[in-house]
């Protein structure tokens, strides 16, 4: 899941796939498509036969625009939104001050987690701008009521609540290195993508780390400009 697409069927919230999997590209063309839960099971089984474990990622609290386009009530502003069709980071994220947001995410996780028998579940946690939270009365009330210092600690609060759901289902949580900000969730494995520093910091606190610095391991570019 991301700002650009939601690509898995959630039976309790059908608009996630119906709306979140359809994007109008910058050139006017339409990109669409999602996996049904049965298709996910087929992919997981195919991978397992080849000794590959598929690890799902449901991005939160940021990179959530596809979900918020389908269900804008879980944002800070109420929308309306459109799926992002260009590079960049989206300011609109899940509202951390709304308890209904956590109910929504728990329902989603309880459908997704059983589809993936592996040990790990990735929650993203990266690139979550705080501009909406800083302006949102509900989020500011949450910060006050939970005795949090700022929006960075609010993100940590958010991740901790999600971690409890994941642990209750017998999974271990993975998140990008931004989950270090405001205090790291106790069981988290950190994927350090912005460099090596986050991984070193997490390891020094006794956490498992996966080093994925963007300069070396994000294989999304051609080998040379000529290609």
Regions found by a protein language model. Name each.
Residues 209, 226-227:
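Short, intrinsically disordered, charge-balanced linker/junction segments flanking boundaries
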Residues 56, 121, 173-175, 190-191, ...:
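Hydrophobic faces of well-ordered beta-strands that scaffold small-molecule active sites
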Residues 1-169:
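Substrate-binding cleft of carbohydrate-active enzyme catalytic domains
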């Amino acid at each position: 899941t991301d700002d650009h697409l939601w690509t898995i069927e959630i039976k309790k919230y059908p608009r996630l796939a119906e709306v979140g999997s359809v994007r109008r590209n910058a050139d006017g063309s339409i990109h669409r498509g999602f996996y049904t839960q049965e298709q996910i099971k087929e992919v997981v089984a195919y991978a397992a036969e080849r000794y590959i474990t598929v690890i799902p990622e449901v991005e939160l609290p940021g990179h959530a625009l596809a979900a918020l386009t389908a269900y804008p009530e879980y944002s800070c502003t109420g929308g309306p939104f459109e799926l992002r069709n260009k590079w960049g980071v989206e300011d609109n994220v899940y509202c951390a001050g709304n308890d209904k947001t956590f109910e929504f995410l728990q329902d989603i996780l309880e459908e997704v987690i059983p589809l993936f028998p592996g040990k790990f579940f990735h929650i993203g946690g990266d690139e979550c701008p705080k501009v909406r939270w800083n302006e949102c009365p509900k989020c500011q009330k949450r910060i006050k009521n939970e005795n949090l210092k700022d929006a960075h600690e609010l993100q940590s609060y958010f991740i901790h609540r999600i971690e409890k759901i994941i642990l209750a289902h017998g999974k271990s949580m993975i998140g990008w290195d931004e989950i270090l900000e405001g205090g790291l969730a106790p069981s988290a494995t950190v994927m350090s993508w912005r460099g090596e520093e986050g991984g070193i910091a997490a390891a020094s606190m006794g956490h498992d780390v996966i080093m994925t610095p963007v300069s070396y391991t994000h294989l999304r570019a051609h080998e040379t400009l000529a290609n």
